[in-house]
Design a protein with these regions (language model features):
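Structural signature of PLP-dependent enzymes
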Residues: 84-90, 108-132, 162
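Active-site phosphate-binding strand-loop segment of PLP-dependent enzymes
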Residues: 1-39
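PLP-dependent enzyme catalytic core of the Aspartate aminotransferase-like
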Residues: 175-176, 190-236
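Conserved C-terminal alpha-helix-loop-beta "cap" of PLP-dependent enzymes
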Residues: 154-201, 214
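Active-site PLP attachment segment
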Residues: 37, 45-85, 93-98, 212-215
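Conserved glycine-rich beta-strand-loop-beta hairpin in the small C-terminal domain of fold type I
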Residues: 117-131, 143-159, 196
Length: 236
C-alpha cells in the first residue's frame, strides 16, 4: 500500500508479500503504472519482479498517452485467459490504438530506452526542482516535512503546525485555482481517528514549471496565513 506518493518496493519486500499471498492461495496484484520496466518513473534502485503468482498491471498513460486508455497485464496464461474472456463480455469493442502503438515499441526495445533515457530523467529533474522551490518558498514559521521523492509525479507534504485541517487548506487553495489532494482521503478504513491524516497533502508536479512554481507560491501563502491566524487566536 503506497498510493500516496509511490513507494517502490524492494525485491525483498515483494518476495515477502508474495510468500504471504501464496500461503493464502491468492495472487499478488501489483499496480505498476509508474514502475518497471516502463515507464520507469522510479528514483530508487528497485528491480522488476514477476512470477506465476503475480498479476502485474502496467499502463501507457504515464508514457504520455492517457487518452489511449490502454492497460497491460502480465500474468500466468490461466489468469490472462480469464481476463480476456471477462474483457470480451464487458467491452463489446475495445479500442486498439494503444496496442498498435505499443507493440512495435516493445518488440524493438524502444519503449525501454524511451523510459530510461527520456521519461525517468525528465521527472527526476522536475522532482528535484520542485523540492528546491518548496525549500525556498515556505516560511520558517510553517513547520513541514516532505516525504522522500522515490518516483511518480507526486510529493507528500506534512504540515506539523497548521491550525486548520488540510481539507480546509484544500478548500482555500481551490478558491485560488490551485488543486491539491487533502491527505484524509488516503487514510480510509481506519477504526480510530488519527490527526496525521488531516495534516498532509499530495502535490502533483507534472505540469509546466511556471505553473508548478506559482502553485507552490500560493500554497505557501495560504499555509503562512493559516499559521498567522492561529497565532492571533492563541494570543487572545
Amino acid at each position: 500500500p503506497a498510493v500516496r506518493v509511490v513507494n517502490p518496493h524492494s525485491g525483498e519486500e515483494i518476495a515477502r508479500l508474495d510468500g504471504i499471498a501464496r500461503a493464502h492461495d491468492v495472487p499478488l496484484l501489483i499496480d505498476g503504472a509508474y514502475g518497471m520496466p516502463f515507464p520507469n518513473i522510479v528514483f530508487t534502485d528497485a528491480v522488476p519482479t514477476w512470477n506465476e503468482n503475480i498479476v502485474l498491471g502496467l499502463s501507457l498513460s504515464k508514457l504520455g498517452l492517457p487518452s489511449a486508455r490502454t492497460g497491460i497485464i502480465v500474468a500466468s496464461e490461466e489468469v490472462i485467459g480469464a481476463l480476456g474472456s471477462a474483457n470480451a463480455i464487458m467491452s463489446l469493442a475495445t479500442g486498439t490504438f494503444g496496442q498498435l502503438m505499443a507493440e512495435p515499441l516493445i518488440r524493438s526495445g524502444e519503449l525501454l530506452s524511451l523510459s530510461d533515457d527520456i521519461i525517468r530523467p525528465f521527472y527526476l529533474e522536475k522532482s528535484r526542482r520542485t523540492l528546491e522551490w518548496i525549500d525556498e518558498l515556505f516560511a520558517d514559521d510553517v513547520e513541514y516535512s516532505v516525504h522522500e521523492s522515490e518516483g511518480a509525479f507526486f510529493l507528500w507534504m506534512w504540515f506539523k503546525n497548521l491550525p486548520i485541517t488540510t481539507y480546509e487548506l484544500y478548500r482555500r487553495l481551490k478558491e485560488r485555482n490551485v488543486i491539491v489532494v487533502p491527505g484524509t482521503y488516503f487514510f480510509f478504513g481506519m477504526k480510530e481517528a488519527w490527526s496525521h491524516s488531516d495534516e498532509c497533502i499530495r502535490l502533483n508536479y507534472a505540469m509546466p514549471d511556471k505553473e508548478v512554481r506559482r502553485g507552490l507560491e500560493i500554497i505557501a501563502e495560504e499555509a503562512k496565513k493559516a499559521v498567522s491566524e492561529g497565532a492571533v487566536r492563541s494570543s487572545r
